[in-house]
Every structure is written in C-alpha cells, then in structure tokens.
Regions:
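Expand to "…catalyze enediolate/carbanion chemistry for C-C bond making/breaking, isomerization
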Residues: 2-628
C-alpha cells in the first residue's frame, strides 16, 4: 500500500488487526477524499446557524426551483416523488420492534463485552440497531471493541457463541419470572431472527483513533461505515441479511447527498451493486423536517425509511430557535410526541414516508424510543409498562411501522402491539400529501401551554450531570433518573444516551438567557410564579444537585467517579448554561475530556473550546490526546 491519506493512533493497527484489515484500510483510503468535502459541508452548517442567530431568522422550506446540492434533482421533483428510491428488502419489511444499544461495554474483557450482542440477537426484536454513535462509549478503544465484537458475532466465532449460550439461559430465567414462560426455544436458531443494523457516527464528529495525514481530525462517519461494511458485507450477504445503516444528525439534503456519494463509492470499490447498502435516516434535526422528500431523493436507492426521535429533535428545535426570546420550551416531561411542534413533526415524517417515488415505492416510518426498563417496584413497573404499551399503541394507530426499545427486556412487552394487528408494515396507509406553506413552517415551532418549574430545572440539571459523568466513565447509554428519586423504586430508571444530555443543558440555557418565567411557586427555593432562572439561582441549583450526586450510593453514582469525571461534568454544565454564546453540541465538551480526569486540565480545555467557537465558530472536534 502506498502513502495513506490518514494515520492510525499509537500501535492500534497491530492491536486490532481483525478490525483494521487490509481490505478495510484500502476502503478507507478510497473514501478519504470525502473528508475535506465533509468538513466544508459542516462549515456551511455552522455558517447557517450563525446567520440565523445574527439575522434572527427561522428555518424555511427550500426554493422549489432550486437543485439539490451534489445532485441534478430539482427540489420540486423530489417533493413530487419524481426520483427513483429503493424497494424494501425482505428482512426489513417487518420491523415491528427494533432494539438499540452498543455492541461493547467499557473496561470489560471480551467475554463480558460481547454479551451485549447476545442479548440483542436473542431478544426477539425484529431488528437491532447496534450503535456506534450516541449510545457507544468512546473512552480508550471502545469504538474498535464495538467493531471487533460485531465481526465476531456476525461470523459466529466461538468467542461469541459460548457467551451467547450462557446469555440465553439467563434471559429465559428472567422471562420465567416476569412472563411465566421462557422467551427463547432454540437459541442458535434465534440468532438468525433479528436483522443486524449499524448506526454510524454523524458527519459532525471525528474519529478518536484515526486522523488525516494532512493533520486534523478525520470523519467518524467514514470510519464507522467503512469498518462495519467492509468487515461484514460478505458474511451478511451470504446469510441473506441486508447491509443496513442508520444515519444520524442529518440536517439537509446536501448532507444526505454526501452520504449517498460515500456509500456509492464504497459499493463500487467492493464490487457490489449501487444501492446495496440501505439506510434509515433519523429525523432528529428540525432543518431536516423542512427537507424530508429532498433527503429521500438525495439518498435515492439507498433510502428505506425515517425514524422519529424525541430528545435530539427537541434539542434541535431549541437550538434553531435560540435567538428568539419569545420561544421558550416548558418542562421536557411535557414535550411528548403529541405536544405542539412534535405532533406536527411526526405528521410530516409519516406523510413523507407514504409519498410514492417514480416507481411507486414508499418508505418505512420507524417510531420513537421507549426508554423504560422493567426494573423497580411492582407498582412502578406496572405503571411504566402500561404507559409504554399505550405509547406504542398510539404510534401504531398513527401509522408507524414499528418502534424502538432501549432494552431487550422491553421487546416482548411492546412487540405484541404490532403482532396483534398482524400487518408487516403500514406503507399502505393514506395520509394527506405534504404541503409547504407558512402555516406548515409555523407548526414546526408551535408551542403550547405547559408547566415550567424549579422541579423541572432540577431534573434537567441532575440528569445532565449524571449523563456527563457516565459519558466520562465510558457509558454513553446509562440508566438514569433525577437524584431526588434515588431509592424510590416506584420511579423507574430510564435508559438514556447522548441526546438526554444535549436537550437538558440546551433547555436550561434557553430558560436562563431568555428570562423564562416559572409557572409555579417553589417552597424550597422561595421562587414565585413569574420569577426567572437567574445566574444566582442556577448556581444554587447546580451546587445542590451536585452535592446530591456526591452523596449518592455507588449504585446511582459510581464512587470512583465522584472525584474524577463528576466534577468535570459539573464544570461543563456550568459553562454551557451560563455562557452567553450557545455552544452547538454538549458532546463536544465531553469528547475533548475523554480519558482526562484532571479538573484543572478540563477547565482549560472547556475554555479553549468555548473561546474558539466564540471567536469564529470553530468547533474543536479532534482528539486532543491523539499522540498520547
């Protein structure tokens, strides 16, 4: 191999030869040309955001006469379905329940780490989105452990099969206690049931183990997609499984077109037909909701469906409207999928999915996440499971082909909602065609009356700090609840990932800098209805919630984190919320402190990042410890 367009950190190429294979590295070299284009597209994203703040502008629909960047497709043609999309492969036509979660655990030996995949593939879920993004820890070499584990499982290596047999027995033991019967009959056969899907990291993130040969970061998206597909495509195709990715954080059709170019180039390099790699797009950015059909068209033969999230989308709305003093969210518990702008967003997604393309092909709508876990008191679990089933029933009625769950124990609780109906999917449902009016645009930022309370602020702050702490420990998916409910088994833990941190600090920033009025008195603080979240009040709440976490049991806050990653999480929460310049991503502040437990150094890095963004919109996204 000649001179590469990238370099790999330390001795990792030798430590992970089964991941950094010759074939995978060759593919990365072919795709490396797209990294500069990605950086340009991300710079344009930052410029649009800055312009909205500067000019106090809302996001709008595209000019119907314009051409989608990187394509020859007119916007109006995309809206009319005048493009060629994709048929839905057989193993993706019925996706009633998709589980989500990483394929690795932090600081764990292989036989423990790989168990995550066994739980997933034995769960009975129709599909499992193995996460390389928001739910996967990025400390040390977790991204490589994730890829290694997936390859071992997909290829049925003995390193996977032995733990899988043990996991099957444990799952059945739990099921007998919860359901009164086992959930797995033939564990080896069961491994073939679930469609394997991978979520790559977003275009805005850079890999921690690879950087550009020219210096600076290198696309995490390209690394994730190349390593997963190159190392597994032959076996997946041999087994009759689709090559399927979830693409996160897409904001525009141009970004979707860049993804399409990356995937088509990889397919050509591998010698497989164009469109072999299928993708779902997570609609978690408000700008994407203004360009749904354009995104479908830009991805063309790759695209099979949209997914509707909650936390990430609320965060995107909050960020896009951060300039507008009149736009203030309520407590996030009130922002459910039937609330104002969320209801309008969900409706646009389902209407985009049932719009046929030139060949009459429609797309899948995968519903949102169920974060509950059936662990707690009998009363707490019963109430939470009724709520979870009711949420699934609502989505099924609205036209979703299925939904997500964050834990394998939820599969057999929620899946019967679709199983009873019996239809593989709901692409045949009829909804009104999409329209592009001012009223449509206004609906996407529609606020409705709901509480905004000190209790809500405490919950936001407590969970945000807990999540930042978990992230620093390598657990980007974590079971969390506000500190005031520690020890209360009637209040269940929710399985949360990076989105939970993003939205919580974003809304606290919004409340503080827009002078949001509380809607109820709070006896503990003396806050009265109409009072604001001042800097002094925020610092008081921060200190009180931080102290609760410091005093919490090891079960809720790991003791070894209380003098390492927890103080850093607190520092980030203070800087993010009190800075007058709203930083675009909480994850940036966490990423630059991965593997760093020194608070003084963390403060320096946090200030470095905030000052760089304040100066000219530069995001520090590369691994500052690459040479260590």
């Amino acid at each position: 191999m000649g001179t590469r367009m990238f370099e790999i950190r330390a001795n990792l190429e030798n430590e992970y030869p089964d991941v950094y294979t010759r074939e995978a590295l060759a593919a990365l070299d072919v795709l490396a040309k797209f990294d500069d284009e990605r950086k340009a597209v991300m710079a344009a994203r930052t410029s649009r955001r800055s312009a909205r703040f500067r000019n106090k502008e809302r996001i709008g629909f595209l000019d119907p006469s314009a051409t989608i960047a990187r394509t020859s497709i007119k916007v109006q043609d995309a809206r009319d379905g005048n493009f060629v999309g994709s048929e839905i492969p057989k193993d993706l036509q019925r996706q009633w329940i998709q589980g989500t979660g990483p394929a690795a655990k932090p600081n764990s030996p292989l036989d423990k780490s790989i168990r995550n995949i066994a739980y997933a593939l034995l769960s009975g879920a129709d599909g499992w989105m193995f996460d390389g993004e928001d739910a996967l820890g990025q400390i040390t070499t977790m991204s490589l452990d994730n890829q290694r584990n997936l390859k071992l499982a997909i290829h049925r290596d003995s390193a996977f099969m032995k733990p899988a047999e043990q996991v099957a027995a444990e799952m059945n033991q739990w099921a007998k206690g919860f359901f009164g019967k086992p959930i797995i009959e033939d564990w080896v056969k069961q491994l073939d049931f679930t469609t394997k899907i991978f979520r790559a990291r977003g275009l805005h993130l850079e890999d921690r183990q690879i950087r550009s040969a020219k210096g600076g970061g290198f696309s995490a998206s390209i690394v994730d997609a190349a390593l997963f597909l190159v190392n597994n495509y032959k076996r997946l195709r041999q087994d009759g499984c689709s090559l399927c990715l979830y693409l996160p954080k897409i904001q525009t059709a141009e970004e979707a077109a860049l993804w399409s170019d990356i995937l088509s180039t990889l397919e050509q390099h591998l010698g497989i037909p164009d469109g072999s790699v299928k993708v779902y797009v997570l609609v978690e950015q408000i700008e994407a909701t203004f360009q749904l059909m354009e995104i479908r068209a830009a991805l063309g033969k790759h695209f099979i469906g949209f997914n509707t999230g909650r936390w990430d989308y609320i965060n995107a709305v909050s960020d896009a409207m951060a300039w507008d003093k009149g736009f203030v969210n309520p407590n996030i518990d009130a922002i459910v999928m039937t609330y104002g702008y969320m209801r309008v967003y969900e409706d646009r997604v389902r209407r985009a999915c049932v719009t046929p393309d030139k060949m009459g092909q429609k797309a899948l709508w995968q519903g949102g996440m169920e974060p509950n876990i059936p662990v707690g008191s009998e009363a707490g679990v019963s109430a939470a499971m009724k709520k979870a089933v009711a949420g699934a029933e609502r989505e099924q009625r609205e036209g979703a082909c299925g939904k997500w769950v964050a834990h394998w124990k939820m599969v057999h609780i929620v899946r019967p909602v679709w199983e009873k109906v019996g239809e593989a999917n709901q692409m045949g449902r009829k909804f009104p065609p999409l329209t592009y009016t001012k009223a449509d645009a206004d609906g996407l930022v529609l606020l409705e009356p709901a509480p905004r309370t000190v209790r809500g602020a405490r919950d936001l702050l407590s969970v945000a700090m807990q999540y930042g702490n978990a992230f620093g420990q390598g657990m980007q998916a974590a079971a969390l609840k506000p500190a005031d409910f520690f020890g209360n088994e009637d209040v269940l833990y929710l399985m949360e990932d990076m989105a939970t941190g993003e939205i919580r600090l974003s809304i606290l920033w919004e409340w503080h800098h827009k002078g949001a009025a509380f809607t109820a008195d709070d006896p503990d603080t003396g806050v009265k209805t109409g009072d604001r979240l001042t800097a002094d009040l925020y610092k008081r709440l921060l200190a009180e919630e931080y102290e609760k976490l410091r005093k919490a049991s090891n079960r809720d806050v790991h003791d070894n984190s209380k003098n390492t990653t927890l103080p850093i999480a607190r520092e980030i929460a203070e800087t993010y919320v009190l800075d007058d310049i709203k930083l675009p991503w909480y994850v940036d502040l966490l990423n630059i402190n991965l593997n760093n437990h020194d608070l003084t150094e963390a403060k320096r890095r946090i200030r470095l990042l905030a000052d760089a963004f304040r100066k000219d919109g530069t995001r520090i996204t590369e691994n500052l410890d690459f040479n260590k």
